[in-house]
Amino acid sequence: MQAGNNGGAKLKNDEFDNLYQKNINRRETETVIRRSIPVQRDLTGKILPNQVAYYEEIEREVTFGATHHILDKDNFDSYIYPTNFEVREYQFNIVQKSLYQNTLCAIPTGMGKTFIASTVMLNFFRWSKNGKIIFTAPTRPLVAQQIKACLGITGIPHDQAAILLDKSRKNREDIWTQKRVFFTTPQVIENDLKRGVLNPKDIICLVFDEAHRATGSYAYTNVVKFIDRFNSSYRILALTATPGTDIASVQEVVNNLNISNIEIRTEESMDIIRYMKKRYKEKIEIGLTTEIEMIIEQLGIAVKPVLQQAVELGIYDECHPSQINSFVAMQKSQQIIANPTIAEGIKWRNFFILQLLNHVGQMLKRIKIYGIRSFYGYFRNKFSEFTTKYNMGKSTNKIAASFYYHPILKILMKNCDVYTSNSSFIGHDKLQKIINELSDFFLNSRLDSRVIIFTELRESALEIVKTIDNMGSSSIRPHIFIGQARGKENFDDEGFIRKNKPKGRKKADRLKRLEEDKQKQLSKAKQKEQEKVERSSRRTGSSEEAQISGMNQKQQKEVISKFKNGDYNVLVCTSIGEEGLDIGEVDMIICFDTTGSPIKNIQRMGRTGRKRDGKILLLFSGNESRKFEKAMEDYYDLQRLIGQNFVEYKKSDRILPSNITPECRKEFIHISAENNELNNMEDSDEVIRYATQCMLGKVPKSKKSKAKAAKEPKGKSKTFFMPDNVETGIVSAIALVNKKKSNSNESETVIKTECFPNLDDIEKDMLASLSSPVKPEVDDYKDGTFQKTDRFEEKITGSNLKDMLMSFSKRDEESKVTSFSSDGNYVNEPFGNISLGEKLDINDDFASTPIVKADMNIGQYDRSLIENNSRGGVLFKNAFEKEEGLLKKSEKVYFRDHYSIDNTVVIEPIPNFKRYNKSCLINHNPQVENILNLFKGINENKTQITIEMNRSRCIARGIEKGSIQLTGSDFSLANVMVAQKNNEADIVWDTSKTNKNSHENLNELLDSDSDF
């Protein structure tokens, strides 16, 4: 395909699909059929304009080629059906269809969904040589159930299985590579697919538990979408008891999971009814007490003016005050806020009216369904919050004020205070019914019987626990079972008043307020601690504490364990107990409230009747019975629609060759000792821990493997999974254009210029290097001359200029120095023969830093000493041996022979106090003495000091302009001589190498006392 001038030809959707190759063996052909339709014509027979003479029918046919998985030809001629348990016809039929199609298995709870999944996983494990089989569930207990079923029933080798539940990613890539059967959560799969740790093309079987969650952007949906980009040849098995609430939600699950077939069974299905344990449903309608009816009437009187105003404004339908619905009021308030055509003032007035109706609707719901205690706790919190804000002027909502300040509510609150102050008061007849049912049940039931009570509200769950505990029966032991979130705290009116009251401007007022806040916090903390101690002394203390702070996973596991062991025999649950609780000893379920969701109702009722017959007690009050019947009716209609093929399925790959039809082999599976151990475990965490140990124990790591692993880099590069026949990597721009050969004869010239620092910078750093004596440094010595290095270029600065010109270290008298003779040759002369008055000529290459000494006798190290010692050792190091310091041994010997202890400073990191233990005053060295004299003269404004400073500046400018040159291996000046007068080093000009004009100008500068 060639690009034109318009920027390139456009690709059609099918061409994009072919280029992308998102499906390995999936092919989709589209057929468009046009069918004519009647149209209007004029008198001449022509079709009138703007009419379509036909409509299009689009037919899509999906075909699959050979799978890319490596199949085991010795095994795919048969499939195994375990006979370790009773062979059930519905399970056998579902397994047979699930092997060839992506299946949604919707059967009642306790009917063996895990056995079906394990059988399918076992056969795909046999059919493929390296395909990955993954089971995923949203919670750890559900994963543990499948581990028991898969390893403890079907006999899949435990050394081929892996459990991926922890957040740690250590060795995750190796586990995905080495193992074949995996038990994990969908979030782990999604993250590892995105990180490139798991190759989507390796997956051959994927099992989803609680598949009704595969809606929206849940992890189930994201996993399938990601795999479909690279792999279409894999089997999906979706397990659930309730596929959805309506046909639309079921269709969404089918689309998201690529379902080709739905196997749905109900409790009335012919092939399942004989395996179902009997569940006796008892529906009891509970009436309202006189106290509740009185409170409802009082609320209606207080809210009636607001309701009439809402009806007159047309924002709420007319109804009796006792029938106000909180959900309807909330929906209408959201519609008003989202409507931009309404004026702001009218919009917020209507919003506050509906907000109040929403709160009143919540109050009515609580008092009708849960009782007076639950209602009054909610009412008291709302009343305290509004009145506190309104009295302080923080709220001006007069609509709500007309309700909360209604006189009849004072009577209501007074009566409720009397009711709730009595611990034995029963706020709803549902609670009395629970007491009666539990008394009769445990009187006639087995010793190992258990009861689960479901309610939606935490405060209602705690009230049920306290009510049962007040019975005083030792045979009934209740406990709460809720989620991890902390309980919502009530409105703190004292804290709000203290925070928003006028603050004094004085410091004393602020300190007083801070002290009051501190005292309030301390008293509040003491009160909470005291309440906690009081709770711990009661039988329901752990339930009360859980209602306040929530229950973490450890506490939840402990409660379930005690419930199974019999420490508790009544469990009061919120929605957290609707899924995953597989306790066969539960003989009765009590639904304290009901919901409009058939999924929740069925999940609740499915907690009993698993190992033996059970009883379901449904308590209704208000409109709950009508809501329950409507939800169940919709559920049965949904099952009927699914059975009548009202769902559009997606075609899936058969995976096995079309000419192969495996035969069923019903076999008794012999379970290994390790796998059989799982069948004796009840705790889900114990199952996961044991399976993990088996997985890790079969892969011992030898010492050699550890050594090899240590050499490997810690961070492995991310793997990007791409479709087949795709050019990977980054293509550089130069690879996309025509290359031009360059002329190889062309030469490149690099000009290097030396840059000297500005004099201003030199002057600032004048005294930077005049510190304690330092070790002389030399550069590499080659062919009898010192070679110039970059290090020297950095050292020619004004900070050490005076040292270079005026200071030299004390040397051996027998040492020699290399100088130029008259004929230009090198001459080695003893250093002692050179006087300060002589002219010293050296090259630009400066190799050492001279040091000033008081006697100014010039000496130098022998060259062999420089070559052997100056570069031979490391100047700086982290550790020093005993009797070792910054100086080398030869240097220590030299300084010990030529300098007395009184005139030297120990510069070793660790002073040798054993040798130099005499305390005395140490004189300043000449450099420090010169610095002190220099600053002393500056403070006293001495003219001679100013002239000396200007003299140094002149020398620096001479070096910059070239009047002074640095040449040779030893230090000398081209036109400057060093002389000694009165033990002071003076600089004189050598007139033989400068012209007269420059000599006169320089003398004028040197003799002047100007400050430039």
UniProtKB/Swiss-Prot annotation:
Residues 493-555 are annotated as: Disordered. It comes from the Eukaryota. Residues 511-537 have a biased composition (Basic and acidic residues). Residues 430-654 form the Helicase C-terminal domain. Residues 94-261 form the Helicase ATP-binding domain. Keywords: ATP-binding, DNA damage, DNA repair, DNA-binding, Helicase, Hydrolase, Nucleotide-binding, Nucleus. Interacts with the MHF histone-fold complex to form the FANCM-MHF complex. ATP-dependent DNA helicase involved in DNA damage repair by homologous recombination and in genome maintenance. Capable of unwinding D-loops. Plays a role in limiting crossover recombinants during mitotic DNA double-strand break (DSB) repair. Component of a FANCM-MHF complex which promotes gene conversion at blocked replication forks, probably by reversal of the stalled fork. Belongs to the DEAD box helicase family. DEAH subfamily. FANCM sub-subfamily. This is ATP-dependent DNA helicase MPH1.
